[in-house]
Design a protein with these regions (language model features):
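Bacterial N-terminal signal peptides
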Residues: 9-17
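Bacterial N-terminal signal peptides that target proteins for export
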Residues: 1-9
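Low-complexity, acidic/polar, glycine-enriched regions of mature
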Residues: 21-199
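Extreme N-terminus of proteins, especially the signal/transit-peptide cleavage junction
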Residues: 3, 18-22
C-alpha cells in the first residue's frame, strides 16, 4: 500500500465516527402539534393549530450544535375550531393562504442552553417575509422503539413573534381602549420524530 493510499484510508477511518454520530429524523405529524396563541380583546387568548406540516431534523449527538432542522407548514390547514374565525384568519387580512400557502423555518445556528436545552436560530418565512427567530427547545429525548420497529425521539419548542413584522397588520380598536387582536403570537411545537431508514 502506497503512502498516499494509507493517508486516504486513515482519513476515512477518522471520518467514520463523525458520520455515524449524525442521524436524520422525520417529524411524525400524527404524534406532533404545531400551535399558536394570540391575545383577544386584551382579556384572553385564542389558540389554534396547523394540521398539515412536514419537517426533517438532523441530529448530531457528538456535537449537538451541528444539528439542523427544516419545517414546512401548510397555512391553509390552520384551525381554531371556529369556522368563521378560521375563514377570516385565512383571508387577505391575515395569513392570505391563497397567496402564501406555506410557512417555513430553516435553522442557521444551534447553541446549548441551560439544563440540556437548546436555542435554535433560524429564518422564519411567513406571509412572504423572512425574519430571524429563536426557538427555545427542550432537551431532546433518548431513543425509543415503537411496536412496529420505528426508532423515535421527541422534544418541544416555543418562540414569540410580532405579527406586524410579517405584514399581519389588520386590527380593530376597542371602545374601552386597546385592540381586538394582540400583536404578539406565541408559537409552540410538540414534536415526535421517526428515524429515517438508511438508504
Amino acid at each position: 500500500m502506497s503512502h498516499s493510499i494509507r493517508i486516504i484510508a486513515l482519513s476515512l477511518m477518522l471520518a467514520l465516527p463523525t458520520l455515524a454520530s449524525a442521524s436524520t429524523w422525520n417529524i411524525d405529524p400524527d404524534h406532533s402539534q404545531v400551535g399558536f396563541k394570540v391575545k383577544h380583546m386584551m382579556v384572553s387568548n385564542v389558540k389554534g393549530n396547523f394540521e398539515k406540516y412536514t419537517g426533517v431534523v438532523e441530529i448530531n449527538d457528538k456535537d449537538i450544535t451541528k444539528s439542523k432542522v427544516t419545517v414546512n407548514i401548510e397555512t391553509p390547514s390552520l384551525t381554531t375550531g371556529v369556522q368563521k374565525r378560521d375563514e377570516h384568519l385565512k383571508s387577505a387580512d391575515f395569513f392570505a393562504v391563497t397567496t402564501y400557502p406555506t410557512m417555513t423555518f430553516v435553522s442557521k445556528k444551534v447553541s446549548k442552553a441551560g439544563k440540556g436545552g437548546l436555542k435554535v436560530t433560524g429564518d422564519l418565512t411567513l406571509h412572504g417575509i423572512t425574519k430571524e427567530v429563536v426557538l427555545n427547545v427542550e432537551p431532546i429525548s433518548k431513543e425509543s422503539k415503537d411496536p412496529w420497529g420505528n426508532t423515535r425521539r421527541g422534544t418541544a419548542a416555543t418562540t414569540k413573534i410580532d405579527r406586524k413584522d410579517f405584514g399581519l397588520t389588520w386590527n380593530k380598536g376597542l371602545e374601552t381602549g386597546g385592540v381586538l387582536v394582540g400583536d404578539e403570537i406565541t408559537i409552540s411545537l410538540e414534536i415526535e420524530m421517526i428515524r429515517a431508514q438508511a438508504k
